[in-house]
């Protein structure tokens, strides 16, 4: 069986995805590298929103939480429950990772509909939600894969790789490919949904600029939240699966 060549081709294909371009892009030239400025700018805005919200909400922590502190404690409890359900009793160390993934994707998705990115003019292209770019979604998916392998190896050591020949060695190629197709499915699902949502809204606004786009925008906010939840749930499930060693 051509297992190694097939795996190399899959990895190369995943790497090449980061070079896919949709529309025009604005780049910064730093040394000999071209930096995708649009994604960095919008990602920094999202990170600033998240950090700023947390700092404001918990600047004066109370024993009995109120207002913003109560809201963020509810979010933390939700993420902990999600992690515990998917990972199991050893979920604790993974709560920050799952929470970061969920919150970054959630705020990124919503920023595409709620923030006026389009009014900011760039020499080339335009600003949009970070998750509207395949580079961002591939990076998030690769981080999930790295966490997936780290969880399995830290729990079981080299015996982790025994799972590839279970329940029978015949499934070795399929089990190997499964680990490389997971980031592909994660990245394309998130990228496709967010890109399609923004394109639909842009088209409807250009055709019927007043009433019709509003319900679509609310639907987009709902589906954007669902996509963040799906990504975080699958990431936690993959980590739990690697630690338990079953499919």
Curated annotation (Swiss-Prot):
Membrane-spanning intervals of the chain: 38-58, 95-115, 134-154, 199-219, 220-240
Protein name from the UniProt record: ATP synthase subunit a, chloroplastic
CDD domains tied to this protein: ATP-synt_Fo_a_6
Statement: the UniProt record of this protein carries the keyword Transmembrane helix: yes
SUPFAM superfamilies named in the record: F1F0 ATP synthase subunit A
Bilayer topology term: Multi-pass membrane protein
Any one Pfam family match given in the protein's UniProt record, by short name: ATP-synt_A
Assigned keywords, A-Z: ATP synthesis, CF(0), Chloroplast, Hydrogen ion transport, Ion transport, Membrane, Plastid, Thylakoid, Transmembrane, Transmembrane helix, Transport
Subunit structure, as described in the record: F-type ATPases have 2 components, CF(1) - the catalytic core - and CF(0) - the membrane proton channel. CF(1) has five subunits: alpha(3), beta(3), gamma(1), delta(1), epsilon(1). CF(0) has four main subunits: a, b, b' and c.
Subcellular location: Plastid, Chloroplast thylakoid membrane
GO cellular component terms, A-Z: chloroplast thylakoid membrane; plasma membrane; proton-transporting ATP synthase complex
Family: Belongs to the ATPase A chain family.
GO molecular function, one term: proton-transporting ATP synthase activity, rotational mechanism
Native species: Brachypodium distachyon
Function: Key component of the proton channel; it plays a direct role in the translocation of protons across the membrane.
Residue stretches in coiled coil: none
């Amino acid at each position: 069986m051509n297992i190694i060549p097939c795996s190399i081709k899959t990895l190369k294909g995943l790497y090449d995805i980061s070079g896919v371009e949709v529309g025009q892009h604005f780049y910064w030239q730093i040394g000999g590298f071209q930096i995708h400025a649009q994604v960095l700018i919008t990602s920094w805005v999202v990170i600033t929103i998240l950090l700023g919200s947390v700092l404001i909400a918990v600047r004066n922590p109370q024993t009995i939480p109120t207002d913003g502190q109560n809201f963020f404690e509810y979010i933390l409890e939700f993420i902990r429950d999600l992690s515990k359900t998917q990972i199991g009793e050893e979920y604790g160390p993974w709560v920050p990772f799952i929470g970061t993934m969920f919150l970054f994707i959630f705020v990124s998705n919503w920023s595409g509909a709620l923030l006026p990115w389009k009014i900011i003019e760039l020499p080339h292209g335009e600003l949009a939600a970070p998750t509207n770019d395949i580079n961002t979604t591939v990076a998030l998916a690769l981080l999930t894969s790295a966490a997936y392998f780290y969880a399995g190896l830290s729990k079981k050591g080299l015996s982790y790789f025994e799972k590839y020949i279970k329940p029978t060695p015949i499934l070795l190629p399929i089990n190997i490919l499964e680990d490389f197709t997971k980031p592909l499915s994660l990245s394309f699902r998130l990228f496709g949904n967010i890109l399609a949502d923004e394109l639909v809204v842009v088209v409807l606004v250009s055709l019927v600029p007043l009433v019709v786009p509003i319900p679509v925008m609310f639907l987009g906010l709902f589906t954007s939240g669902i996509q963040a939840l799906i990504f975080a749930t699958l990431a936690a499930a993959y980590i739990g699966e690697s630690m338990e060693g079953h499919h």
